[in-house]
Amino acid sequence: MSDSSSSSENAPATPESPGRPPRGIKSYVLRAGRMTAAQSRGLEEVWPRLGLSVAEGRQSLEALFGRRAPCVVEVGFGMGQSLVEQAAANPETDFIGIEVHAPGVGKLLDEADKRGLTNLRVYRDDALEVLDKCLPESSLTGLQLFFPDPWPKKKHHKRRIVQPAFVELVRTRLAPHGYLHMATDWEAYAEHMVEVMEEAPGYRNTAPPESAPYVPRPEFRPLTKFESRGERLGHGVWDLIYARVE
């Protein structure tokens, strides 16, 4: 029961761009999907207003949204349900979604337009490219990674997005005290996340002692249909929130 995440995976940083994972291994597989009329409308009519591209390069968040406000990025938003809910509930915060799958991007754009949201922008690009080339350093209030592909087979673990180089790249984009919030329904992946984060410099775990290393699901993370179905089936969900300390 895991959503797919839009980001490539990582290994050691390259000399040309310290802290940036190389592009070779991807944490996602692009699959052809049928588009509904609403999804197509989102891509065709709403994209020119809310869509962004790596080709546009680095821009200030103030330039993207026309104001200065806290900004949260979600990597791999799937069909966009939780991201739209958060943007609608928090008009004082700006949100950037990153997703490679066209149906999800189209669905998000259609819903954002129907709700009249102005605090949401979308990249249909590899998340590592966006983080590295587009988002300013020390600029983000938070980054969300909800239910990334767990790649459960051992031979595929290298495809998991949560790797040392990835979390270091995220750290450089977070403002001081900004947070990295991850959620997964695969306990083994949750344990992997903890292992990576506990070794990562410049982070601290925000979990209370009674539930550490995990945090109870925060109220600000919407409960999606996907997660609700999992709960009915008895699946667990593990949330982790780490804050940048420098």
Curated annotation (Swiss-Prot):
Q: Which SUPFAM superfamilies match?
A: S-adenosyl-L-methionine-dependent methyltransferases (SSF53335)
What's one GO MF term for it? Answer: tRNA (guanine(46)-N7)-methyltransferase activity
Q: What residues does S-adenosyl-L-methionine bind to?
A: 74, 99, 126, 149
Q: In which pathway does it act?
A: tRNA modification; N(7)-methylguanine-tRNA biosynthesis
User: InterPro entries, alphabetically?
Assistant: SAM-dependent_MTases_sf, tRNA_(Gua-N-7)_MeTrfase_Trmb, tRNA_methyltr_TrmB_bact
Origin: domain of life: Bacteria
Q: What GO CC terms are in its UniProt record? A: tRNA methyltransferase complex
Keyword terms:
Methyltransferase, S-adenosyl-L-methionine, Transferase, tRNA processing
Q: Which Gene3D superfamilies match?
A: Vaccinia Virus protein VP39
Task: Give the residue ranges for region: Disordered.
Answer: 1-26
Q: What's its catalytic activity?
A: guanosine(46) in tRNA + S-adenosyl-L-methionine = N(7)-methylguanosine(46) in tRNA + S-adenosyl-L-homocysteine
List the active site. Answer: 149
Q: Which Pfam families match?
A: Methyltransf_4 (PF02390)
Q: Where does substrate bind?
A: 153, 185, 224-227
Report the coiled-coil segments. Answer: none
What EC identifiers does the entry list? 2.1.1.33
The entry's function note states: Catalyzes the formation of N(7)-methylguanine at position 46 (m7G46) in tRNA.
Q: Which family does it belong to?
A: Belongs to the class I-like SAM-binding methyltransferase superfamily. TrmB family.
According to UniProt, the name of this protein is tRNA (guanine-N(7)-)-methyltransferase
Q: What is the lineage of its organism?
A: Bacteria, Pseudomonadati, Pseudomonadota, Gammaproteobacteria, Oceanospirillales
Gene name of the encoded protein? trmB
